[in-house]
């Protein structure tokens, strides 16, 4: 699933479409997580004037309307020319003045929706702060983790706590600060929380700089792969040696997600604070 760095990179790669007018819209398959709106043709004649990201949503601002785009598990956008070969799972084609924008999604868990009061309230307003914003700091995170008994990794992946810290980047951040992913979130000391916040920000910034992580088939709208996966120290490395102590990395499931960790560098402390 694309995480925050991949969505940010995708958004940036769509910038060539800014200030271009929509000439036509073709819906080849409306059946995504939620159906593509019947009135999506309203975009015709409007210019794309803004692209922003909130959590894993791309917010596309047109002259009269706004749209909310989510890549789901396997979605991607691609900038194409009209004569480029169509792929089986190209579900939406928006023809701009100079290029086509195609939405491709084999598993169809993504969404293409209008951004309106209903979707704003349902999908946006309940989200936690952006991890790279000044709103995400140690004091804030400590207040959200207080008395939580769930594992810290599960807490970090809760979009009500902080957005966009998915499996890859939570795994790497916890490895780098030596915290076991199953450690009860409420047990972390303030010093650990401070280090964790700094590391989350560093990891995400680095991943964005490297174009995200291409683990299976992710690429941005220009067809370019990311390279952060080449720097991974824990994620996807179960049964390999820890780069720090040469202990064999282990894997456990937390919240239905694989969590790789080093039992030596990330010991699980079982006693909770009084």
Swiss-Prot record:
Question: EC no.?
Answer: 3.2.2.23, 4.2.99.18
Superkingdom, natural source? Bacteria
Q: Report the active site residues.
A: 2-3, 56, 257
UniProt keyword list: DNA damage, DNA repair, DNA-binding, Glycosidase, Hydrolase, Lyase, Metal-binding, Multifunctional enzyme, Zinc, Zinc-finger
Q: How is the cofactor bound?
A: Binds 1 zinc ion per subunit.
SUPFAM superfamilies, per the entry: Glucocorticoid receptor-like (DNA-binding domain) (SSF57716), N-terminal domain of MutM-like DNA repair proteins (SSF81624), S13-like H2TH domain (SSF46946)
What is catalyzed by this enzyme? Answer: Hydrolysis of DNA containing ring-opened 7-methylguanine residues, releasing 2,6-diamino-4-hydroxy-5-(N-methyl)formamidopyrimidine; 2'-deoxyribonucleotide-(2'-deoxyribose 5'-phosphate)-2'-deoxyribonucleotide-DNA = a 3'-end 2'-deoxyribonucleotide-(2,3-dehydro-2,3-deoxyribose 5'-phosphate)-DNA + a 5'-end 5'-phospho-2'-deoxyribonucleoside-DNA + H(+)
Tell me which SMART domains the record gives: Fapy_DNA_glyco, H2TH
A Gene Ontology molecular-function term?
class I DNA-(apurinic or apyrimidinic site) endonuclease activity
- What are the residue ranges of zinc fingers typed FPG-type? 233-267
* Function field: Involved in base excision repair of DNA damaged by oxidation or by mutagenic agents. Acts as a DNA glycosylase that recognizes and removes damaged bases. Has a preference for oxidized purines, such as 7,8-dihydro-8-oxoguanine (8-oxoG). Has AP (apurinic/apyrimidinic) lyase activity and introduces nicks in the DNA strand. Cleaves the DNA backbone by beta-delta elimination to generate a single-strand break at the site of the removed base with both 3'- and 5'-phosphates.
Q: Which HAMAP family match?
A: Fapy_DNA_glycosyl (MF_00103)
Q: Which family does it belong to?
A: Belongs to the FPG family.
* Record-given protein name: Formamidopyrimidine-DNA glycosylase
This chain's source organism reads Acinetobacter baumannii (strain SDF)
- Could you read off the lineage of the organism from its UniProt record? Bacteria, Pseudomonadati, Pseudomonadota, Gammaproteobacteria, Moraxellales
Q: Which gene encodes it?
A: mutM
């Amino acid at each position: 699933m694309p995480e925050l760095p991949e969505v940010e990179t995708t958004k940036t790669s769509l910038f060539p479409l800014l200030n271009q007018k929509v000439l036509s819209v073709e819906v080849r398959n409306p059946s995504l997580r939620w159906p593509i709106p019947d009135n999506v043709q309203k975009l015709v004649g409007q210019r794309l004037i803004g692209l922003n990201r909130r959590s894993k949503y791309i917010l596309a601002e047109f002259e009269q309307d706004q749209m909310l785009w989510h890549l789901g598990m396997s979605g991607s956008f691609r900038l194409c020319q009209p004569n480029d070969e169509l792929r089986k799972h190209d579900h939406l084609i928006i023809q701009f003045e100079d290029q086509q924008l195609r939405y491709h999604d084999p598993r169809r868990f993504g969404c293409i929706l209008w951004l309106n009061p209903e979707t704003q309230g349902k999908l946006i307003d309940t989200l936690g702060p952006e991890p790279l914003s000044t709103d995400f700091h140690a004091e804030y995170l400590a207040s959200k983790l207080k008395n939580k008994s769930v594992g810290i990794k599960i807490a970090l992946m809760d979009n009500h706590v902080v957005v966009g810290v998915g499996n890859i980047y939570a795994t790497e951040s916890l490895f780098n600060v030596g915290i076991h992913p199953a450690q009860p979130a409420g047990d972390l000391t303030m010093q650990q929380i401070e280090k964790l916040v700094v590391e989350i920000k560093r990891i995400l910034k680095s991943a964005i700089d490297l174009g995200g992580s291409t683990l299976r088939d992710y690429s941005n709208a220009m067809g370019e792969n990311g390279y952060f996966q080449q720097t991974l120290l824990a994620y996807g490395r179960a049964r390999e040696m820890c780069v720090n102590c040469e202990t064999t990395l282990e894997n456990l499931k937390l919240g239905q997600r694989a969590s790789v960790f080093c039992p030596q560098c990330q010991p699980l402390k079982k006693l909770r604070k009084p």
